[in-house]
Design a protein with these regions (language model features):
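N-terminal beta-strand motif that seeds the catalytic metal site of vicinal oxygen chelate
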Residues: 1-10, 14-38, 42, 88-93, ...
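Vicinal oxygen chelate
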Residues: 2-4, 18-21, 23-31, 49-51, 60-61, 65, 79-100, ...
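Amphipathic alpha-helical segments
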Residues: 32-47, 101, 105-108
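Surface-exposed beta-strand edges and their flanking turn/coil or helix-capping segments
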Residues: 41-43, 80-84, 106, 126, ...
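A short, structured beta-strand/loop element
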Residues: 69-71
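Short amphipathic beta-strand starts and helix->beta connectors
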Residues: 73-77
Length: 140
């Protein structure tokens, strides 16, 4: 009698390489691109894009992300949390100190809606001068 041997068959599964996208830009509609760019430049420290103008202004982050602001005729600010004019998108920024960041942003021209859906020790909702809501969140 000969011993039975198991034959192992290697099966190669071909996996399709998934295309990975890198976020290159975030652009917000607004009535005054240079003014909104100035607000976010002071808030974030991002560098102004050299080709900014009255129709489209932008800021560059060190890693290449562009934060853009495009002029829209008859712009209507989001009415958050009301959905009459929905927000459509919002950004979140990590900050080391919520109270300090909030005070600074309000001084720069941000607004603070009455409706605050988060634990105020973790995150707060503010609005930029064009009415876009954004969050500041405590790191960690």
């Amino acid at each position: 009698m000969t011993p039975k041997t198991k034959t192992k068959t290697k099966t190669k599964t071909k996996t399709k390489t998934q295309m990975k996208m890198k976020l290159a830009a975030i652009t917000l509609d607004c009535p005054d691109p240079p003014a909104l760019a100035e607000f976010y430049q002071q808030a974030t420290g991002f560098e102004p894009h050299p080709k900014s103008d009255a129709e489209f202004a932008a800021l560059n982050r060190e890693d290449g992300l562009l934060l853009g602001f495009q002029r829209v005729d008859d712009y209507r600010a989001p009415q958050w949390p009301d959905q009459t004019v929905p927000q459509q998108a919002h950004m979140c920024f990590d900050v080391p100190d919520l109270d300090e960041a909030e005070a600074r942003l309000l001084e720069l021209g941000a607004g603070k809606p009455d409706h605050q859906p988060h634990d105020p020790t973790r995150a707060r909702v503010l609005t930029d001068p064009a009415g876009h809501p954004f969050c500041i969140c405590r790191r960690g």
